[in-house]
Amino acid sequence: MDTLLSLANGFSVAFEPSKLLFCLIGVFLGTAVGVLPGIGPALTVALLLPVTFKLDPAGSLIMFAGIYYGGMYGGSTTAILLNAPGESASLATALEGSKMAKAGRGGPALATAAIGSFVAGLIATIGLAFLAPWLVELAVKFGPWDYFALMIVAFVTVSATFGDSPLRGLTSLFLGMLLGLIGIDKLTGQARLTFGVPELLNGVEVTTLAVGLFAVGEALYVASKRWREPEEIIPIKGSLWMNKQDWKRSWAPWLRGTAFGFPIGALPAGGAEVPTFLSYSTEKKLCKYPEEFGKGAIEGVAGPEAANNASAAGTLVPLLTLGLPTSATAAIMLAGFQQYGLNPGPLLFAEKPDLVWGLIASLFIANVMLVILNLPLIGLWVRLLAIPQPWLYAGILVFATMGTLAVNPSPVELGMLFGFGYLGYLMRRYDYPVAPMVVGLILGPMAEAQLRRALQISLGDPMILLENPISATLLGIAFIALVAPFVMSGLNKFKAAED
């Protein structure tokens, strides 16, 4: 009952004209950047951080969430019509969606993707609304040792999830944690790693790092490669709508995809790629027409797209209740909260209920807006693919520079922006994930503060981390998550050597 009352109050916030406008802008931008390969919601939110710092926090965060949801929708368009997923989570959709488009059924493929995303987003957002308060009640009971252990789990799982190598993920994470040490030590008041530069006394701005790594780094990386003409877009033939048979074959995959996407997205090592491919393989086994798989089975589009969007809502569960990002976009959204002096977690639900529940309520509205916008404007989304990449990324560089200077007109800040941008370019070139570095900068100082608090309570005894059951369990999970990839890699090499 309390959840329904809170949600009703949230809708009263979300239906304010300014909030509706922010939501509309968010879903429109999100769909547009989801369509464009290589852009994505994480880069877009990072670009908008500097220009939204003076806006209303609730409106800005609603817009960021709309961009996140819209990016999930938009990625399916290029996956189906171009066989080039705008988002990695749309890879599974491309397997059958592009085949449907080539067979003249691009319209039904786009329709089942859009409606499946709507159904999954709606169900998953309901799950978020009812699961979040329960997790908040649990998190209130956490001591500093439990929070420290939880952040260790986040560090390990984020490092293992992003990129192909856990070791490279950990390297990126440690770089971010090292940057988090810069500034004034809150316990002793001493300057750390500032090298006599006054601008570093307040630490490294998360916004500068995020924009540098995601926007400037991506632009430099694209510029370093030889630009290619976009691939030929598969034209949409026939009806844009689904027939009775398509509806009959799609509804069960939508529900199964949602069941995969939401819980896996809510896990610290979840993400959207795992549930989408899990949904694809499940639909391939359960399909009554297995001969169609690989040639354009509608179940292979319906299930993965539902899983994709459900995982987006699932990602917001640990972000809002525990302050733990489980995707690149969630990490940038966490930076968005922090630029307004807000820390997601149990206290945020108690201190800013209108903001939190307004954000959750806006997700329902965003889903409705997206299903209305996607199909009628399909021609507009396709035309975006004709924008030359040099123009697009040159615009990103200019926008990133102007936005950063607007927040902090300092030569040092500008130097850091392009320094982080060049670092982001090098990390992409040598296949190091950039998201763990942002997570390290955000969560590193928080983990340090919780560890210090725990040691102060225990009079310096580190065994307090193992004496409490919750923290001991979490540290055990972190250890297994850290060791497992290396053990599996060793076993695979051993088996390969035997063969």
Residue ranges: model-predicted function:
Residues 27-41, 70-83, 158-163, 259-268, ...:
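Transmembrane alpha-helix interface/packing and boundary motifs in multi-pass membrane proteins
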Residues 33-42, 80-91, 123-127, 264-273, ...:
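Short helix-coil transition sites and intra-membrane helix breaks within transmembrane domains
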Residues 58-62, 99-116, 288-300, 328-331, ...:
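Membrane-interface alpha-helices at helix entry/exit sites of multi-pass transporters
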Residues 41-50, 64, 79-99, 130, ...:
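Re-entrant/interfacial helical elements at transmembrane boundaries that shape
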Residues 68-79, 86, 297-322, 326, ...:
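A structural-propensity feature for long, helix-poor, extended segments
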Residues 69-74, 115-127, 135, 179, ...:
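Membrane-embedded alpha-helical segments of transport systems
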Residues 1-60, 133, 140, 191-297, ...:
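Helix-loop-helix hairpins and the membrane-proximal interhelical loops
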Residues 111-227, 339-493:
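Membrane-embedded alpha-helical modules
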